[in-house]
Amino acid sequence: KLSRFEGAAGQNLVFIHEEGGKLVRIVLLGVAEGDTADYQKAGGDIIAKVQTSGAKHIAVHGANLTAQHAAEVAYGATLRNWRMDKYRTKLPETSKPTVEALTVVAAPAEAGGHWTSYQAIAEGVALTKELVTEPANIIYPESFVERCQHLKELGVEISVLDDNEMAALGMRALLGVAQGSRRPARLLVMKWDGTGGTQK
């Protein structure tokens, strides 16, 4: 009552509990009659509360969650846990992320199937963030192409156009931008057949 926590969507409460001689941080998050966005936000809020707390493994009590909602919580947490800190040389120790894993405990068995799809999306989001966050001396046309080559293993069809090929296709605007750089231009084309090869 003192905390006024009633489980409303977006409401949270953090407290410390002693368990087996150890102090455990417990985060309560409200989703009310929440929709997909509420459960994903709840997952993100969990990480926001503990990301730099020193905790390495987070357990989410999922017994009262549907399989879909359990996967959504994990998805939101995964998205929120992404950070680009490798160039931050003066980051205080207490500001460094520590969370390495999150487990949704006692979730319905079907949650794993839902998570497979969400995990693929989360990995794609992380790759995109990495590519747009890296500085220009690290990610430039040629290195951008190189960073994406591993997508071939997933079935993505990749083709690359160089300066001459782009000029032959009349891509003068793109080449005009490239003239301001000492790096050669590249155009990466990616195709994904989501039908498993049945589409012609």
Walk through the language-model features, giving the residues of each.
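Short amphipathic alpha-helical segment within the helicase RecA-like ATPase core
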Residues: K1-K200
